[in-house]
Amino acid sequence: AEADAIREGLEEIRKDIREGTFHFTAAKEDIHLHIESALTEKLGDTGRKLHTARSRNDQVATDLRLFCRRAIDRIDAGILELQKAFLEMGNREHDLIIPAYTHLRLAQPDLAAHQLKDRCEKFHRDRQRLADCRQRTNIMPLGSAALAGTSLPIDRSKTQTALGFDAIAPNSLD
């Protein structure tokens, strides 16, 4: 019952934030304090249970990784769309001859498709770097608590799966 109330309260807070009706104040130092305060205002002491077995350090580290993971995915999707557009243009303009430059000087004629394919290869390497970054980012720190873990019996694997992390941080200090 309490878990459902917390979940519903968080959904209401998310809605308020998205609609721009959530009141932020400098008196509360970060988003976590804002959310916990709003939840406690809605639910009383039940709202304080939001961070049971989860320190604010835990929450910040986890939120940062979730934020970065979403950003990486958006950037990767954008680069993929750009690659598709370049390939489509290269296929459409496969006979188009354009000037090629070296050291900012006209060098020789080249095919536009060749230049566009070059950009796609570079984008491919960028996407590989993003995939590596995502893999390194997508490790769940939640459960590390403030420093050396929590004494409460928590199921980190269940949380990992629910949040879509590939692995659990093997050391709470990392």
Regions found by a protein language model. Name each.
Residues 1-149, 153-162, 166-167:
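A helix-coil-helix interface module used to build multimeric assemblies
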Residues 166-174:
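Amphipathic, heptad-repeat alpha-helical segments used for oligomerization and assembly
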